[in-house]
Amino acid sequence: EISEGLVGSEMCIRDSVNSIKKIIKLKDPTNIVLEKWKRPNGLNISKVSIPIGVIGIIYESRPNVTSDVASLCFKSGNPVILKGGSEAFYSNLILSKLFRKSLKKNKVDENFIQFIDIKKRTVVDFLLTKMSRFIDVIIPRGGKGLVKKVQDLSTVPTIGHLEGICHSYVDKDANPKIAQNVVYNAKLRNTAICGATETILLHKQIIKKIGNSILKSLEE
């Protein structure tokens, strides 16, 4: 249900805070030497991780996306422009203001994180077709319709998926009890999220052993 993702309950806020704290603890992903080699002429070449640049995020509903994306982009050194759905407009606006306030307090340019505080859908079209000089990549986060629109119209490079890609695979050596619990959790813990399992793949040698029990648990 879309309403589930919009509820700003104490638990949801606590989960968002915990998510931010986990991101803070992650190692800096930039300026890491991923690979290096020496050419026959003596030239040393290094492959180093760097920020992508300005990232545009177009997403629907969930306010937690605002906090997660803002945190991840700041952690990775990528300025971000956020365009959230109208369903959670005011929650997103408040969250973005809190992030900007925190940046300013810590003497960081608050414009590192920007939120488009306009509800009109034409803003999305403008981002996709008129901002190629200012945005390096656009990432859509939402339903199939949104992702397809972004991929069809964008003059900016995009990172996204069109069809569902969430699979759960059970190998032939898997513990049946654990496998059943994992598949059940992946599919039914929260069916509203885009990360819920859509396809279950079973190794042919384990189908007879666990197939029916998995299906039965999902049906119940």
Where are the predicted features?
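Active-site/ligand-binding-proximal alpha/beta "capping" segment
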Residues: 125-137, 149-152
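ALDH superfamily catalytic-core signature
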Residues: 61-64, 68-79, 98, 105, ...
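Membrane-anchoring hydrophobic helices of lipid-metabolizing enzymes
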Residues: 17-36
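A glycine-rich helix N-cap at a beta->alpha junction
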Residues: 100-116, 136
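A structured beta-alpha segment of the ubiquitous adenosine-cofactor-binding alpha/beta core
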Residues: 22, 40-47, 114-132
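Conserved small-residue-rich beta-alpha loop and adjacent elements
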Residues: 30-102, 106, 154-160
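General beta-strand structural signal in soluble alpha/beta enzymes
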Residues: 82, 114-117, 139-142, 158-161
